[in-house]
Amino acid sequence: MGRSELTIYIVEDSPAVRERLIEAVVDIPNARVVGSADAVGDALEGMRAARPRVLILDVQLRGGSGFRLLKLMRTSGLSRPEAVIVVTNYPTEDYRNASRECGADHFFDKASEFHKVREVLLAL
């Protein structure tokens, strides 16, 4: 029996980084990006429709933050993805702790740990 499809939703305000994330998963067996957004409201709507297994999100978003999105997912009754991966250009300890408190499983620095996103996805 094969692995079930690894559906991924990406929330990132930078088109270049969003494209880089899509490119990082394109050749992973059974992985498919089912949607993307650059703002909290659009992400909530898209996640509700797509029900992905994995959420990859940035901290800084258009009109809000990744932390706000995670909190809204919880309070709106949206089921939590199997894995939540936060990627940021601001890898401060405060952001790392806030990510953990909001339910993120992984926290990576875009500049030095981008490859770890792919490693996590391959392990799922």
Feature map (PLM): residue ranges:
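Acidic, metal-coordinating helix/loop segments flanking the phosphotransfer/catalytic sites
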Residues: 36-54
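Two-component/phosphorelay signaling modules centered on CheY-like receiver
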Residues: 15-35
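Conserved acidic carboxylate
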Residues: 12
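Alpha4 helix (beta4-alpha4-beta5 surface) of REC/receiver domains from two-component response regulators
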Residues: 68, 91-108, 112
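Short amphipathic alpha-helix used as the core "switch/output" element in two-component signaling
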Residues: 67-80
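Active-site residues of response regulator receiver
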Residues: 58-59
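Acidic catalytic/metal-coordinating carboxylates
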Residues: 39, 65-68
